[in-house]
């Protein structure tokens, strides 16, 4: 399609369905970032094959959208930051970036907890950097429907004496944040830690398997588990 008209002024505030809106519009590349998307529920295949489109749409309010399948399928030019999108209502993300060859943005803040289908979401998205793969994996892999194993690209904050206790405290106050920052506690690399004194003091609910920890350099471990209740896994 040769369509490339300026439609930035359209009032779409009451539109609920934008499925296939620009499908096959290979010439379209107009600024539509100010559109009011707050009522949209379905945007599957919206930019399917819109191979020229690369305008900012990161400020769109997509919090009501439940279906985002194929949105950027073969949108080969698109590479705009959409990491602030609220996708917490979405259940379908399959083929979303399939062959979106230029896309290389962080989606680490996306809440994909309700997503039931992420099949081939990034297949042939050859522009996606290893660092962004790692960040995406950290955020998405908690969903059992995540189809990729990008664990090799994941990097976590190193754990040392300076932040070990902070990491432990964060695990108990915000497990999801702790996992995103340091990884799951069972997998922590504590080989640089020398002082674990009172680390789990009074943490009566703690029962994670940390038997794989490398504590070879620990010189202070007194009162590590002091608590009214003994831990089962040490």
Give the ranges of each region predicted by the language model.
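A short, hydrophobic C-terminal helix/tail in secreted or cell-surface proteins
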Residues: 228-234
